[in-house]
Amino acid sequence: MAEPTSDFETPIGWHASPELTPTLGPLSDTAPPRDSWMFWAMLPPPPPPLTSSLPAAGSKPSSESQPPMEAQSLPGAPPPFDAQILPGAQPPFDAQSPLDSQPQPSGQPWNFHASTSWYWRQSSDRFPRHQKSFNPAVKNSYYPRKYDAKFTDFSLPPSRKQKKKKRKEPVFHFFCDTCDRGFKNQEKYDKHMSEHTKCPELDCSFTAHEKIVQFHWRNMHAPGMKKIKLDTPEEIARWREERRKNYPTLANIERKKKLKLEKEKRGAVLTTTQYGKMKGMSRHSQMAKIRSPGKNHKWKNDNSRQRAVTGSGSHLCDLKLEGPPEANADPLGVLINSDSESDKEEKPQHSVIPKEVTPALCSLMSSYGSLSGSESEPEETPIKTEADVLAENQVLDSSAPKSPSQDVKATVRNFSEAKSENRKKSFEKTNPKRKKDYHNYQTLFEPRTHHPYLLEMLLAPDIRHERNVILQCVRYIIKKDFFGLDTNSAKSKDV
């Protein structure tokens, strides 16, 4: 008994194609043999029977019941497909057009077209094979014509492909300009306005929501946020008057000069040290001297000589070469030149002081010159006078003979010049290609200034006031001849 089959089943002797892959049936007995297997395989398959039901059990196969087809043989080429296609027969896969490549039921004509045109991707071989799952290039065997794989990105979900619709902006009829909010109806607007509060400051009339008022107070009334207010004519006139007082006119310049002279007479000659980023760009700063080597060439040579002398192991390292000690030195110069930047980490073992200054006053100044912010006790540096052989009576003598400091200065100069020449020659020998860089090499080794501590920057006004008080005390001691050394009282009064 014949079993019911679907429309796509074939008669006995044909293998079903699960993926609609054409198969080759047995050749007819009358077909002439080919020279090679390829030409034999390229022959079109025989057409399927018109009826969908299977033949009876004792019947012969369809290939034997039908009359044999005469295949047209051409030497060296397969027969054309159109010559053996019968009505209702399915052409081979290679001969199908992309539009008519769908599987057709047995009862439908071949001129049927679907609403969406589909086509099957063909492999690179001559015969189409089953698609392999491990090949990502042929993972999807077919696509709609208008959604081709070359132009469509299937990695994105379909929701993202669609364009997002623009949301309609809400329409507000009531606005609060202070809070920058809008409301749709009068009730919400009235509720919001009832939540407005006033700024807690007395002179401020700002009203807004509580959170907005908090931001307003932080930005306008917080400590350190006070700004110039020129709302009334009186405030504008007061501000203009202050500007006129500080404007650098000739009268204001003369007035400032007089104030400066009065401070110098009192002994308050120090000013508050300025700290900031632009301090390194000043005229006498360390960075300015490095960037402009030509302007301070003499100063660099003097420092190089001093370093050469202090670096040597000779007996001249006990002297501080800051210049020849003057016979009539002003003790104010010791504290004027000693600001926060003059404190070095490495203190000299010995120092030369002027003859007029007494040991008690020198110890006071040396202990004061130490770092005030340090926790440890200030260490007193040992003081060595210029000439121990000369006694105190030579200080009182105005017509004293020439001090041996001049001979020491000449010896130091000759020694430093010889040292610098030897240093230059050794540098040229070791680096013959960098003779031109000797000047730059010499300017790099300059004394580093002391980096100010945070405590020094915070207490800069107090430090300036304290040092000015000490300078006034020193001035008073010299004028009144407190120690009984009537050296040059007349000259000190003129100062």
Swiss-Prot record:
ZnF start-end (C2H2-type): 174-196
Subunit structure: Interacts with FMR1. Interacts with ZNHIT3. Interacts with NOP2, NOP56 and RUVBL1.
Summary of the tissues where the protein is detected: Expressed in spleen, thymus, prostate, testis, ovary, small intestine, colon, peripheral blood leukocyte, heart, brain, placenta, lung, liver, skeletal muscle, kidney, and pancreas.
Gene, per the UniProt record: NUFIP1
Role description: Binds RNA.
Source species: Homo sapiens
Compositionally biased spans, kind Basic and acidic residues: 416-431
Pfam families, per the entry: NUFIP1
Chain ranges for the short sequence motif Bipartite nuclear localization signal as given in the UniProt record: 243-260
Subcellular location: Nucleus
Protein name, UniProt field: FMR1-interacting protein NUFIP1
Signal sequence coordinates: none
Region Disordered: start-end pairs: 1-108, 277-357, 413-435
GO cellular component, one term: perichromatin fibrils
Keywords on record: Metal-binding, Nucleus, Phosphoprotein, RNA-binding, Zinc, Zinc-finger
Gene Ontology BP terms: box C/D snoRNP assembly; positive regulation of transcription by RNA polymerase II; RNA processing
A GO term, aspect molecular function: RNA binding
Entry superkingdom: Eukaryota
Residue(s) carrying Phosphoserine: 338, 340, 342, 403
Segments of skewed composition (Polar residues): 98-108
PANTHER family membership: FMR1-INTERACTING PROTEIN NUFIP1 (PTHR13309:SF1), NUCLEAR FRAGILE X MENTAL RETARDATION PROTEIN INTERACTING PROTEIN 1 (PTHR13309)
InterPro entries with a match to the protein in the record: NUFIP1-like, NUFIP1_cons_dom, Znf_C2H2_type
